[in-house]
């Protein structure tokens, strides 16, 4: 795992793929599909120390516009070791969230359904990107929405653009076919005061 391969993961799954324009209006197209090209899904990287990014474990937001990671918070090695206990040391996590108003202004009540549809597209794109890199991904399915909001720092963010935490994916950059045994002791309390 290095900064270049991590960049490739995001580039192949969630990045801007092209720009279109028509009669003076310009808009981006992305690698992952989205209903109405509205892209309500946001992504966050949780990683240990990574050369080129940070010397400490971090939570970063992925910006498709800049194809860059925006560090939101650092946390201790102790918390990181607890998070990856029983997993390979180069494991990373990607958290996904939805911003419902990006769909609701156009689709009304159907926005909830379309946001989850787009979440599925993002999950599939990440999984395909991992497979192309020879990596494995698995859903961390035992965290509550509230726990995930705390871990991603979404419980303390601007209330004008509410993000709802959707899921967390563990990514292991190796071809080991053994079953991933995720540490069920990821405790959101460790992340409460990061932001």
Where would I find each of the regions flagged by the language model?
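Acidic, surface-exposed loops and disordered segments
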Residues: 1-195
């Amino acid at each position: 795992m290095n900064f270049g391969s991590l960049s490739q993961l995001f580039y192949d799954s969630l990045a801007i793929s092209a720009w279109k324009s028509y009669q003076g209006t310009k808009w981006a197209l992305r690698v992952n599909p989205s209903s109405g090209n509205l892209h309500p899904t946001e992504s966050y990287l949780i990683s240990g120390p990574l050369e080129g990014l940070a010397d400490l474990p971090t939570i970063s937001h992925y910006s498709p516009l800049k194809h860059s990671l925006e560090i939101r918070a650092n946390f201790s090695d102790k918390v990181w070791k607890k998070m990856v206990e029983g997993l390979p040391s180069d494991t990373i996590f990607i958290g996904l969230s939805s911003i419902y108003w990006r769909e609701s202004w156009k689709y009304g009540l159907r926005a909830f359904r379309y946001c989850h549809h787009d979440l599925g597209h993002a999950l599939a794109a990440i999984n395909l990107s991992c497979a192309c890199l020879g990596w494995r991904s698995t859903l961390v399915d035992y965290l509550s929405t509230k726990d995930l909001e705390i871990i991603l720092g979404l419980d303390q963010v601007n209330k004008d653009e509410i993000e709802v935490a959707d899921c967390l994916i563990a990514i292991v950059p190796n071809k080991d076919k053994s079953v991933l045994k995720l540490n069920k002791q990821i405790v959101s309390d460790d992340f409460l005061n990061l932001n």
